[in-house]
Amino acid sequence: MVEEKKYRVESDLLGELKVPAEALYGVQTQRGINNYHISRKTMVDNPDFIIAIAFVKLAAIETNHSLGVINDEISGAIAQACREIIEGKWHENFPIDMVQGGAGTSVNMNANEVIANRALEIMGHEKGDYQYCSPNDHCNCGQSTNDVYPTSIRLALIRMNTHLVGALTGLISAFRYKADEYSDAIKMGRTQLQDAVPMSFGQEFNAYANNLEEEILNLERNVKLLHEINMGGTAIGTGLNAVPGFAKLCAANLSKLTGENFETATDLVEATPDTGAYVSYSSALKRLAVKLSKICNDLRLMASGPRCGLNEINLPPKAPGSSIMPGKVNPVIPEVTNQVCFKVIGNDTTISFAAEAGQLELNVMEPIITESLFESLTWMKNAIETLTSECILGITVNKERCYEMVKNSIGIVTALNPIIGYKKSTKVAKEAHETGRSVYDIVIEQGIMSKEELDKALDPNEMLQSHKLTLK
């Protein structure tokens, strides 16, 4: 008796299976739970994905109702169930592992079963009484995993991209703030880790901000590719079992529901196995990761020391740095951001291999593409938010040390090139390097320039921008 209350029995092609009595999912979801213990990350860990598939199912039921395929009562109950999921309800009923075989069939059926069973409850029936509302005949009407799954992925990625861009915008603002705060702080620019010419921290931090703004534009360019969908193509793009007009009306309904501009692919047979949009978007994430990792490398290098490194900036101390070396504090926030960037770059390689592995009319490797993209987006967003709040906003600059390094640098001799010529400047630089004396003292001692001329030429602030030049 207790056993009967804890479980209900459902059946499918492979036979009967016990399902928890209170679960909104059914037999095919239970098989997915039993089969896949891979990533230990489920749909529950990706609420944007659950919401996305509910939007797709809502657009589909509205389309089928408008075309006279499903009656008012069933379509109304299914639509209500979808809206509840979109509002955040019933998400615990999506326990399927994100990495799975079957090209996402377990995910699609998980959604179909949850929606069907919730619709049954709304209509006053028992869960599992599928004669009144079927996961396949009603919730999946005119659809296939092969159009529902990729469309849901695309919508989820669009939603997650918005979160990522928001985090990036915050990081850019933080760099702009620091650029303003230290606009007058002079430092030595370096190329190949050798002294180059002076610059300001305002220029350095603004360059980081501008660099990242380019990445927002690149992400937005690539996310547009995700707005082409194959809903209505059903199994392989031929539209079998979808009524005429379903594809375009479903895209229009999905656009209206989400506020996004979705369009039906021109060739649904071509679109069904195509993963090019995922590859392009992942490439944009990789490009962001490469640039962000470089910025973190710079921050760690500029903060090196405190006595025997550059010690140009101070990063906020976040944790004791060693179990054996007293007083050591490490740049842990840039370090963790670096590691996230490595992960995103690696995920891009996984996505490339999975995209290449498609065969004929379908790419069955979409689950690993999906999980890799979701992981990259989630990790990157979290890392950027952490970098912003726990590191960038707390950066301070060691102005006096930076100025002393500029003043004593051999690199400032570059500013004398237009005045005394490259050859003479090279001799001054060589002597300064060999003797340890300053460029300033050597030029004055040898009478190459007057003190007044030299003071003006070697004013660090004058070296931060271009000037009118007349060669003698």
Positions of the model-derived regions?
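Conserved, well-structured ligand/cofactor-binding cores
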Residues: M1-K472
